């Protein structure tokens, strides 16, 4: 996937475990665990576009189907992040939106709320991360309250323009203010782990490798 954002390019070369270790080293939070990938999804990373959905009346202005504004804002450096924590069993994302997002090149979706048409998303190879699935439509149940305003997903508040990485281990949010030092630290950790792996392959006993490196990796 082509990206114009160098930070996104570097973030996509990492995984959530390395980024989580970097957050630990820097004393930062932002890790959400237990958020499954839809079957067939892959690791994603990018800049955050937010959506907030809830029951009630939509904001003033011409009516638009939920999700369409976020998709139109998106590009290959983007991940759409959705807050739909109302408790209403209604889809905050669906198959046509996944298709439109895939056509735009958007990296994927992270949703704190029920997602529908998950089989369609899987079949087209569009990554979706969510804890909840449903068949129920949003129509007459929830509306889009805001786009690119702060949202809270899985207990973590994130803003448009922040960064997110998601894989089988976790979903991690990093503020725009901290992204450069987090990526740099994660790259350093990956480099140290590569040297450890090289030592194991060369025959160094694993207890020696782990004792001399692993326990002190986040301190040095």
Go through each PLM region and give its residues.
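C-terminal binding/interaction regions
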Residues: 164
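Channel- or pocket-lining gating/hinge segments that regulate access to a cavity or pore
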Residues: 170-172
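Feature captures the catalytic cores and cofactor-binding loops of soluble hydro-lyases/lyases
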Residues: 1-160, 174-206, 211-220
């Amino acid at each position: 996937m082509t990206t114009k954002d160098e930070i996104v390019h570097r973030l996509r070369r990492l995984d959530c475990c390395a980024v989580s270790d970097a957050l630990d080293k820097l004393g930062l939070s932002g890790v959400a665990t237990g958020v499954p990938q839809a079957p067939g999804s892959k690791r994603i990373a990018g800049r955050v576009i937010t959506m907030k959905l809830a029951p009630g009346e939509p904001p003033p202005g011409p009516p638009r189907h939920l999700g369409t504004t976020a998709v139109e804002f998106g590009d290959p450096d983007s991940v759409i992040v959705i807050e739909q924590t109302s408790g209403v069993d209604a889809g905050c994302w669906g198959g046509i939106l996944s298709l439109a997002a895939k056509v735009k090149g958007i990296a994927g979706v992270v949703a704190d709320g029920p997602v529908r048409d998950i089989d369609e998303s899987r079949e087209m190879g569009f990554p979706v991360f969510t804890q909840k699935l449903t068949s129920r439509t949003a129509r007459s149940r929830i509306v889009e309250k805001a786009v690119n305003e702060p949202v809270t997903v899985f207990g973590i508040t994130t803003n448009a323009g922040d960064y997110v990485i998601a894989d089988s281990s976790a979903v991690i949010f990093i503020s725009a203010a901290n992204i450069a030092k987090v990526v740099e630290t994660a790259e350093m950790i990956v480099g140290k782990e590569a040297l450890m792996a090289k030592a194991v392959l060369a025959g160094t006993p694993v207890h020696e490798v782990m004792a001399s490196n692993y326990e002190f990796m986040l301190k040095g």
